[in-house]
């Protein structure tokens, strides 16, 4: 903008003054463009499915996305911030992590950040999802993370235990400043329906990082006037997790309970580790879910995953993983894949 003004009005003192003002504003603000591309090739056969199908898939270890974020220094240690991030499927070029997802489905918010914490409004991360991905060795993988798969994906067992996306629309989030390794966040959403307070969604989590030890606790309460996919209208999920690094090995543990007002209950536990092996890392994780329906027999689902992640550079890595599932009364699942992930 300044170069255009100077080129047209190089002899005008007023224009030079304007450019100086704009230059100061630019020096106090910044915008970044970034993202991640992840594709894999392999066979994904979930429990209860029939046959094997080779595929090229998107998001083997991390869901592919691109985004932009910016900040403006308002003085006194306060900044105005915004973030817009969009999932995409690199294997077919479609937008969204799944059909029908909003364009900026990963997150989209604007807010303020300062010494007193951070406040954002828009489509914010589910705080339960944040605590889920940070405390398992496969992170936010919707293909190879047993904890993520058991929590957020439907299966032959029925609807997914947690009936929310990874981000929540029409939400307000406050995150406290870090103190002694501890941060706390709270989320509120009215589900976008004015006057329907009973349909509000609430979420909160705490994160603690100190040396080799880290821990989290999270709760999420969802309400709807219609029916969730599991037939309920109210749902509460509780999660606790911890991790400990012992030299080159990091151990993970998570427990989650999800209750619904139709008496459906899901209990999930995850144990895992990541271990340095040469330049890369061996990843191991197991998750087991016990579903107690209001009627009928209990259902047990077990998933074990073994993987290896090898960095080619600071931004690019290659990986391979094998996943095996068993579930009550259905055929087992057997999946394998290898892929490449690049950050930009």
Give the role of each language-model region.
Residues 78-80, 116-119, 181-184, 212-217, ...:
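Repeated loop/turn-to-beta-strand initiation elements of outer-membrane beta-barrel proteins
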Residues 28-43, 54-190, 198-200, 207-211:
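Outer membrane beta-barrel
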Residues 38-40, 85-87, 124-126, 187-191, ...:
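Outer-membrane beta-barrel pore domains and translocons
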Residues 41-49, 88-94, 127-131, 192-196, ...:
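Gram-negative outer-membrane beta-barrel proteins
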Residues 23-27:
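Sec/Tat signal peptide C-region and signal peptidase I cleavage site
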Residues 67-69, 109-111, 173-175, 205-207, ...:
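Outer-membrane beta-barrel architecture
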Residues 201-305:
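Detector for outer-membrane/organellar transmembrane beta-barrel domains
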Residues 332-344:
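Outer-membrane beta-barrel "beta-signal"
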């Amino acid at each position: 903008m300044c170069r255009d003004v100077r080129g047209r009005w190089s002899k005008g003192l007023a224009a030079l003054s304007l450019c100086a003002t704009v230059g100061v504003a630019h020096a106090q603000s910044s915008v970044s463009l970034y993202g991640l591309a992840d594709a894999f090739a392999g066979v994904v056969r979930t429990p209860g499915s029939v046959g094997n199908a080779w595929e090229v898939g998107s998001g083997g270890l991390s869901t592919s996305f691109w985004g932009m974020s910016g900040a403006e220094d308002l003085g006194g240690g306060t900044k105005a911030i915004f973030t817009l991030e969009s999932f995409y499927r690199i294997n077919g070029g479609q937008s969204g992590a799944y059909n029908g997802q909003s364009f900026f489905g990963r997150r989209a918010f604007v807010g303020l950040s300062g010494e007193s914490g951070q406040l954002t409004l828009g489509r914010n991360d589910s705080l339960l999802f944040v605590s889920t991905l940070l405390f398992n060795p496969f992170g936010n993988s919707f293909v190879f993370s047993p904890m993520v798969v058991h929590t957020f994906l439907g299966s032959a067992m029925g609807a997914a235990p947690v009936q929310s996306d990874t981000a929540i629309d029409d939400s307000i989030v406050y995150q406290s400043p870090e103190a002694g390794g501890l941060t706390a966040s709270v989320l509120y959403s009215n589900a976008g329906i004015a006057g329907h307070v009973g349909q509000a969604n609430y979420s909160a989590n705490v994160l603690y990082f100190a040396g080799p030890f880290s821990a989290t606790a999270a709760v999420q309460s969802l309400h709807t006037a219609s029916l969730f996919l599991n037939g309920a209208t109210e749902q509460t999920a509780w999660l606790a997790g911890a991790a400990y690094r012992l030299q080159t090995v990091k151990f993970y543990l998570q427990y989650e309970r999800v209750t619904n007002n139709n008496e459906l209950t899901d209990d999930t536990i995850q144990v895992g580790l990541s271990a340095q092996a040469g330049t890369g890392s061996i990843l191991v994780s197991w998750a087991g879910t016990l579903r107690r329906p209001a009627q009928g027999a209990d259902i047990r689902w077990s998933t074990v995953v073994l993987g290896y992640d090898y960095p080619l550079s600071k931004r690019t890595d290659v990986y391979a993983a094998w996943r095996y599932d068993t579930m009550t009364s259905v055929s087992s699942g057997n999946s394998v894949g290898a892929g490449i992930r690049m950050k930009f």
